[in-house]
Amino acid sequence: MRRSLVLAGGGMRVAWQAGVMRALEEEGLEFQHIDAASGGILTAGMLLSGLSSREMCERWSGVDVKDFGSALPFGDYLKGPWSLPAIGDADGILDKVFPALGIDDAAIRARAAEPGAVEGSFNVVEFTEKRCHAIDAREIDAELMAAGMSLPIFLTPLRRDGKIWTDAVWIRDANVAEALRRGAQEVWLIWCIGNSPYWGDGPLEQYVHMIEMSAAGALLADFEAAAAAGREFVLHVIRPEHPLPLDPEFYLGRVDADTLISMGYRDARAYLDSMTPDGLAKDARCTSMTEPAPGVRFIDALHGEVDGQPLAFRAAVVMPSQRGDGTPQLSGYLDHPRFGRVFLADGRVEVDGEDLSYRARVLLDGGWQDLALTRTLHDDPGPDAWSDARNARLELGGQKVELTMGLGDAAALLASVEPVGAHGFAERAQAVARFTANGFRELLRRY
């Protein structure tokens, strides 16, 4: 079975794809070809540079997202908004982000030239011809890779030898056609571009909607062309249930790489657990998402010791504002020197009396083990609502460990609270205020 991995774009949020790759690697899936467009170029660059999925996750954790932005010469900004070449350039990506992520264009070319190597292709648009080129990994270089992520308005294009190279997103954001041209019998599409019915107001959201329409439209055109040619293949798609936070939230620290990675792992495991050998129908439903119910997202971190060494638990919890609007979502990881970082699969939140529990599975010591982290909440809502939330019991593989939320963890939790699925200022503020006032008692009240 010849498999192609098709990595769609998604900006800096493609940190999510590192979590997906961790799950696929654990399953032993191998690919003979990797294709990438836009932000997916980062994931392909890491894979084709020889990084394991574990290394990819570690490197994303250490990236400073501010390095994605680098300023133009000061004189360019004096031209005024109507003559500004772009908000910034790709120097930060080339000089800081690529090295931090372990992306080495020389290594990519060298590895691609080896006998039996995984094939690679990077989609970049040449503007003078308005044409998308799937540049082979044997011919790619760092400047072209960065150009493939240089969105108009935000980053300047690459000008080279009379040609202008830029992000392919306005033509396509995933190249299934290239995968089929290279003989794929099975295509794994890793998709983190929003695709819900929600239409937002304002220039940023509508700029993103244009990307969504271009990306989804080109994908459907690939499906239709394959069907017209009688080209059969199996399609698997890993995508979030709800659209991921946008890049500005990542850049401003309202979501971080570790959270996106854990979400990617959660979403990949959800698909792997439910997939069939026949894959998915090749239509608009394969990448469709739903809007989350109004609520909040927060980061819950606790620490303890096992065998005299530090144990860290970290969860990202998405909690709807009203019971019946949906179930809470849970993703995250457990970290210990003996086994490293293991991610949560099938995460859920359960309430039993005054006990609030996070439950999930983790792949540990070659097998799946059930994990439960439980708080018993006695205090009434009010100023002391957080005091009894600082202690929890972790159960894993028959072992029980006491974990504690330090003052720094509690402060970080409160600082991490972000509204989700809420689009007006009043609705967003209300969701955050209610949770921060009542703490984890709010979960008991609702669920």
Model-derived regions: residue spans:
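Beta-strand-enriched cores of mature, soluble protein domains
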Residues: M289-Y447
